[in-house]
């Protein structure tokens, strides 16, 4: 059963990668599907203001928020794309408990030397000579649990295993990478890779 599921996942990712390989955009909608607020400029998707575009082995590209979602101030130099503005919460950590106090697993975005289920995303600035952190890849992101915070004030979308559902998010509380700004982004990340 595990082998069949792994084969399906790998085949789906291969089909997705072929469909999205170095694709040039022609309209904003194509970019918006991958990252909310992105626009098509000169046949290339551009991230919104206060975001930087970074290469993603599983998604082609992602946008990193320069600002922390909880404080609105400039965020840490290493972060993951999701949750938006709080990606530092889901960086792979160098301990068995994987808590925020453990050091992050650093990597080189040129070699993508992260463990299975993670990919190297170049940070906002290098740390200790390495330019990236190991972040959940597309499949791992979609497999993470949804952290629905009753006290949350921000509406978000998460993949529950079959569809994208709405929930409330509090950026000051622990979260997972399964946290999308829009339903379209959630579907693009999770639902559509198995379609």
Curated annotation (Swiss-Prot):
InterPro entries in the record: Cuticle_assoc_divergent (IPR053014), Kunitz_BPTI (IPR002223), Kunitz_BPTI_sf (IPR036880)
Annotated keywords: Disulfide bond, Signal
GO molecular function: serine-type endopeptidase inhibitor activity
Presence of the UniProt keyword Flavoprotein in the record: no
GTP-binding found in the keyword field: no
Coiled-coil ranges (or none): none
Signal peptide: 1-17
Domain BPTI/Kunitz inhibitor, chain residue ranges per copy: 120-190
Protein name (database record): Kunitz-type protein bli-5
Gene designation per UniProt: bli-5
Disulfide bonds: 120-190, 164-186
């Amino acid at each position: 059963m595990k082998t069949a599921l792994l084969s399906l996942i790998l085949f789906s990712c291969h089909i997705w990668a072929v469909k999205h390989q170095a694709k040039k955009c022609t309209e904003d909608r194509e970019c918006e599907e991958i990252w909310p607020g992105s626009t098509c400029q000169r046949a290339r998707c551009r991230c919104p203001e206060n975001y930087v575009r970074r290469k993603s082995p599983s998604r082609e590209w992602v946008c990193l928020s320069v600002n922390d979602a909880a404080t609105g101030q400039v965020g840490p130099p290493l972060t993951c794309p999701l949750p938006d503005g709080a990606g530092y919460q889901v960086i792979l950590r160098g301990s068995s408990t994987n808590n925020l106090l453990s050091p992050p697993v650093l990597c080189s975005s040129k070699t993508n030397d992260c463990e299975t289920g993670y990919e190297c995303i170049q940070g906002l600035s290098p740390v200790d000579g390495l330019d990236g952190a190991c972040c959940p890849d597309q499949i791992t992101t979609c497999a993470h649990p949804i952290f629905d915070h009753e006290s949350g004030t921000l509406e978000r979308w998460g993949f529950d295993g079959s569809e994208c559902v709405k929930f409330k998010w509090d950026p000051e509380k622990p979260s997972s990478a399964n946290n999308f700004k829009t339903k379209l982004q959630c579907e693009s990340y999770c639902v559509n890779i198995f379609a």
